[in-house]
Amino acid sequence: MTNLGRLYPLLDDVTLPDDIPYSQVSDWELRFLYLLGRHRLTGEDGIVELGSGGGGSTYALALGLRDNPVFDERTGRLHAYDFFHVGKGTFATEKFFTAGARPVDGGTSFLADFRARLEPFLPFLEIHAGDIHRTSDPDDTDPIEFLHIDIAKTPRVFRCVAERFLTRLRPGSVVLHQDFAGPRLPWLHYSTGALLPYIELAGPPIRSTLAFEVSRPIPAHVLKSVAEDAYTVDEKLALISAVQDRIDHDHTGGIPFKSVLEMAKAYVAHYAGQYERAWSIAGPLESDAYLSRTRASHFEQLRKGPGR
């Protein structure tokens, strides 16, 4: 069992507060964040959450840190990055407002709501509100102990994450990819394939979240290739296949990741303009019960590729 894998048996023992802020991640993922904060992290290096949303994941992680006797609230810092507003260019929901809907005055920022929800942890919480390209420092080389990625919804944002955060990982750093069950984000999957020689997977994904620990220094040329997306379509497909060899289902058995990753391959081809190839990969997956139930719009998009 891996070091992170030792947390899996503890998931059923975690009881989070009933009033934990709204989150788009599952209760299982929130429990795992708590366990990481409680049992694994120290605060000696950076603890970073990219995509804090309404604060549920931040709250669970911060609660674990507060319950951790090793974590020093005077010196340790949890960094929370997000736009903290709804509207064009964001993936935020109005449920992130305390009232569950946008204010009557039409305001788009839920930053004040986030601060109020996280008030118990403000002494060690640093909030970075705005576009990640502006709120992160390209010259920051301080090591990162923990990186929670729930922001890489576009290639442009993922490049920023790769250039400014992945480069700060060291052996022992822990990374969570929250959107790993999203076939439309194949850069998460083939970049993980590129990192496989240097990381240790915690175990099966916790619902949609893949967790891993860096086990060896990641060479600069690998990080550069990941950041610059310097892979051919065939190379990307091979890298995803390498991940498929390591992952079957999520920890509950409910998400068939081999099929999810196969659909991610279809999106690699789709985004490259190889629409016939994309559908040749995706078409046979229509018989998969999980994908046909949860990804109907994906099949429709791939079936109607502009070149078909």
Regions found by a protein language model. Name each.
Residues 1-44, 56-59:
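Class I SAM-dependent methyltransferase Rossmann-like catalytic core
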Residues 7, 41-306:
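S-adenosylmethionine/decaboxylated-SAM
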